Amino acid sequence: MARVLKVAAASAAGLFPRLRTPVSTVRTSASLSSHPGAGPVWNLGRLNHVAVAVPDLEKARAFYKNVLGAEVGEPVPLPEHGVSVVFVNLGNTKMELLHPLGSDSPIAGFLKKNKAGGMHHVCIEVDNINVAVMDLKEKKIRILSEEAKIGAHGKPVIFLHPSDCGGVLVELEQA
């Protein structure tokens, strides 16, 4: 069996030569510029969390804690964002369970369209959110607020318009 896997891997590497070539990471917006040193510099960091809107917060907590055995936090109401959140520790990242807090919550609107809940957004850390905002605006990426707001982790966050991000709502959080 091990020999079969080695042969398959070797064949795949031959078919896909890029698999053997290290991929250079795009680290800064300036690295994309044709003029070295031009433009603001900011670094994209790790995936902080994946947020999932849930119609029943306690049921979702129980699933991740009792069925999957994950480390699950307590619900935290965030009235300024119109949500209650629960973080599920997944080792190298987190899942954020979102539940509406009030009828005008953006999550209430999401759950009206998606009765069973579902993936709401991804959150990626950046090393300088203010410079990232300036650079993204210059690149015509729409930001859903005029300025960064304090998010669930007590750090500045912004959201990027899904239409500019391949249909995904992207949250950037100051690392």
Curated annotation (Swiss-Prot):
Residues 1-35 form a transit peptide. Residues 46-175 form the VOC domain. The modification N6-acetyllysine is found at residue 149. Co(2+) binds at residues 49, 121, 171. It catalyses: (R)-methylmalonyl-CoA = (S)-methylmalonyl-CoA. It is an enzyme of class 5 (isomerase). The keyword Isomerase applies. InterPro entries: Glyas_Bleomycin-R_OHBP_Dase, MeMalonyl-CoA_epimerase, MMCE/EMCE_epimerase, VOC. The modification N6-succinyllysine is found at residues 113, 149. Its main location: mitochondrion. Its EC number is 5.1.99.1. GO terms for biological process: L-methylmalonyl-CoA metabolic process. Keywords: Acetylation, Cobalt, Isomerase, Metal-binding, Mitochondrion, Transit peptide. It is found in: Mitochondrion. GO terms for cellular component: mitochondrion. GO terms for molecular function: metal ion binding; methylmalonyl-CoA epimerase activity. Methylmalonyl-CoA epimerase involved in propionyl-CoA metabolism. Belongs to the methylmalonyl-CoA epimerase family. This is Methylmalonyl-CoA epimerase, mitochondrial. It comes from Bos taurus (Bovine). The lineage of its organism: Eukaryota, Metazoa, Chordata, Craniata, Vertebrata.
